[in-house]
Amino acid sequence: MSSPTAAEIRRRFIEYFEGRLGHEVVPSSPVVPHEDPTLLFTNAGMVQFKDWFADTELASARRVVTVQRCMRAGGKHNDLDNVGQTARHHTLFEMLGNFSFSDADDAAALAAAASKGEPSPLKAEAISHAWTFLTEVLRLPPEKLMVTVHEDDAEAEHIWRDIIGLPAEQVVHGGEDNWWSMGAGAGPVGPCTEIFWDQEQEVDGERWLELWNLVFMEQLRDADGSLSPLPRPCVDTGMGLERVVSVLQSVRSQPLSSSQPLSS
């Protein structure tokens, strides 16, 4: 059986989240943001949803799936210096993403879970969806995947260990690399869990290739750096399409040949 192409992986991703899970498909926003003066280029799938993360009542859908064209050539996510130096970095790439914007029903479910000492349903949902897609839809061997969790995120570790069933050696604690924010200023922040693929040998000095980052926006950071609970927690995930293609096709690097005009 031949390895799936980038187009096939895109299709499977959308079909999984839209067809099986009921997410709403949102088209890629322009690589050059039209109404965001803080960015020269769109560098992540969550960019077009910034306002929704800040106020979930603005969200037109609770669950969303996208394939976002991204460029990282400056700012917080600047991959420009790594392009050509490693096989895994590209200036222009596509990010597969799914997002959850909690509403009153989610808030009630979160409160009920907390009262019972159970983990966040939003976290459990996001982790389960990602794991199922990788191991059942793409059929990646579970034993070749490893995850990281923030050292203080006992919920995520519990979900991976006790619900998904990963052994302890496949769940690694992290620090700053497992804490997400939009930048240095005010805005939503929270822990993240990352899923890595075992390349079995070092490639550009790295044995483990990061595939998917699942961000749990749980707190709001004020301008003075103080943290408070986010009234409506959200989930933001992103997975590099090119990296998934490289894994499934067993090649070191897979830049896509179907790039579209940047300013469309």
Predicted regions and their residues:
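Structured aminoacyl-transfer and RNA-binding surfaces used for tRNA recognition/handling
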Residues: 1-264
